[in-house]
Amino acid sequence: MKLFTSKMLERLMSEQKKKSEGLLPEIVKRLIQSKCSDLSYLRVPDGDDIWAPGYDGIVVNETKTTYVAQGKSVWEFGTNSDSLEKINGDYKKRTTHPLGVEKSDTTFYLVVPKVWAYRISTTEWEAEHREEWKAVHVYDASVLCDWLNSEPAVCAWIMQSYLENELIKIDTVDREIGRA
């Protein structure tokens, strides 16, 4: 059962347009903290702190998880209307100027809060761009929602903080819980 859908994420980002640039990193940071129990470094500025120069996020994870590779990773977030343009621009910028990061030892994540709807699939895009990095991953709204739905605490935080008017109905073995 999906509590959180891609359409909900896209709507949240469009309704919270001014906040979305800082909200997307906060969501991903909370997901990383929730999923990764063996982090040795986490820097993902969010909210008002997103204007710091450099990568949007740097993570060192000692144990591989479903969504975060083992080792060092760098993260770029984009809330622009053209996700592909943003991803291509960030990839080119960081590949040309990696800011001291050893690309062959680093996984590069590009995150956008919209469903990927381009002729080239994310898998094809990743395959075409992974030569210079240890690995490259594109996380779109679909991947983010799968991750959110695997982390109920983060999902509940978003719904309580930003989607309080969303109808949620959860059936459990013991009882039905509803909110309108």
Feature-to-residue mapping (PLM):
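Mixed-charge (Asp/Glu-Lys/Arg
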Residues: 1-179
